[in-house]
Amino acid sequence: MEEKKVALITGGTRGIGKAIAIKFAQNGYNLVLNYVSDRTNLEELKQEFKKYNIEVLFIKTDVSKFEECENMVKLAIEKFNKIDVLVNNAGITKDSLLLRMTPEDFEKVININLKGTFNVTKSIVPYMMKKRTGKIVNISSVVGVSGNAGQCNYAASKAGIIGFTKSIAKELASRNILANCVAPGFIDTDMTSVLSENVKESINAQIPLKRMGRSEEIANSVYFLAGEENTYITGQVLNVDGGMLM
């Protein structure tokens, strides 16, 4: 019987991250998922993943802290002896216009979104290099490409992820490790569900497909780049945005 592959997904307990985790579970991957403090939905998730006949390891990890990321990877390797796929999805927003933004809110977003991506990737790459194989998919955003008023911290973090990904793709290609970005547009999640209907309508008007994306559509794109069928794409940014950026 073929050994199951292992995917480590940060921010994988809710929203887009949860959809990504489910996609990998459906395809028989064992999972490593981090959580920060909220354990309320972990039992529910455990039950949900049971039907896929896989193992899931939940590890409390603040991705902005390098030592915690190192420990998460160490525990994952002890459990599964490998990590085939890394999806850096953990992210937060602290939106405000530049004139009102506090240095603390700028730093928090950079620390989770960009530094967190560095921390987890740096912790995992030595194991992938030893195996001479691996897939890394980092979740950026269309605002990392285009910018967005009121989100200079978030846009900077997501633009940084693109530069980071292209750089590591060049460094790791000789070891058969592929690194790519998925850049979602407006996606229908808990974060967007609080928006008023008027705001949603104005957002949809900017999108050629006239609707927000679904988390599952992001998950499908991530799985394509991280799955076995991708053997020749690296250092790329896949915009999944309903045609916003062309």
What residue ranges belong to the model's regions?
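Residue(s) in the substrate-gating loop at a strand-loop-helix junction
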Residues: 141
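C-terminal substrate-recognition "lid" of short-chain dehydrogenase/reductases
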Residues: 118, 133, 177, 211-240, ...
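Substrate-binding pocket helix/loop in short-chain dehydrogenase/reductase
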Residues: 97-98, 105-110, 203
